[in-house]
Design a protein with these regions (language model features):
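Conserved GTP-binding G-domain of TRAFAC-class P-loop NTPases and closely related GTPase folds
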Residues: 2-8, 12, 17, 25, ...
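Conserved substrate/cofactor phosphate-moiety recognition/catalytic segment
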Residues: 17-78, 124
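Glycine-rich, phosphate-binding/catalytic loops in enzymes
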Residues: 28, 97-100, 127
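Anionic group-transfer/hydrolysis microenvironments
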Residues: 38-40, 85, 114
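Glycine-rich phosphate-binding loop used to anchor ATP phosphates in small-molecule kinases
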Residues: 57-106
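Amphipathic alpha-helical transducer elements in NTP-driven molecular machines
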Residues: 59-63, 67, 112, 137-144
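Conserved beta-strand segments of the P-loop GTPase G domain that flank and frequently precede/overlap
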Residues: 82-83, 109-112, 160
Length: 163
């Protein structure tokens, strides 16, 4: 059992499942900061993100750069709500390295939302124009084809959010 009281909150869900909304709610807790992948990617690579390959490359660069800092923040006792999609086994393995490296607790918030609901939210989000990225339904389908829900074998502390 860890003596570190910090918690790393992770979010898993398809595009427009409500991850960022949940992240904002979780981020209101005392001694908690939010780290948003979309903000970092849009700031660091604004002209480079046009495909899944571009996203994977840029996200991997960001993860390599930011991991040591996140571990130190967690070791310092601050909780982090990580607004990076925990949507593949490999990504969740990277996230496991963060909380294990920091010796802190974790929660994997899994948002189980149908494709139809996500696409309706996506259309609304795109129309609102307030999100860092506009995602087409075709892009949604491509990203969703790589989505892998968390499994018991991964041994995460999963909190299920059904919508």
């Amino acid at each position: 059992m860890s003596s570190n009281i910090a918690t790393l909150h992770l979010v898993c869900g398809k595009i427009a499942a409500g991850k960022s909304t949940l992240v904002s709610e979780l981020g209101q807790s005392p001694n908690t900061i939010v780290v948003r992948e979309d903000h970092w990617l849009a700031s660091l690579y604004p002209e480079e993100l046009h495909s899944l390959v571009d996203y994977a490359r840029s996200s991997a660069r960001l993860r390599r750069a930011i991991a040591p800092h996140l571990i130190e923040v967690l070791r310092g006792g601050l909780s982090i709500v990580l607004d990076f999609p925990a949507n593949t086994v490999d990504t969740r393995a990277w996230m496991r390295g963060l909380f294990e490296g920091a010796g802190c607790a974790h929660r994997l918030h899994y948002l189980e939302v149908s494709d139809e609901v996500c696409k309706a939210r996506l259309r609304q989000r795109n129309e609102d124009g307030k999100h860092e990225f506009v995602v087409s339904e075709e892009q949604f389908d491509i990203f969703t084809s790589h989505f892998v829900p968390p499994s018991d074998e991964e041994m995460f502390d999963v909190i299920l959010h059904r919508h």
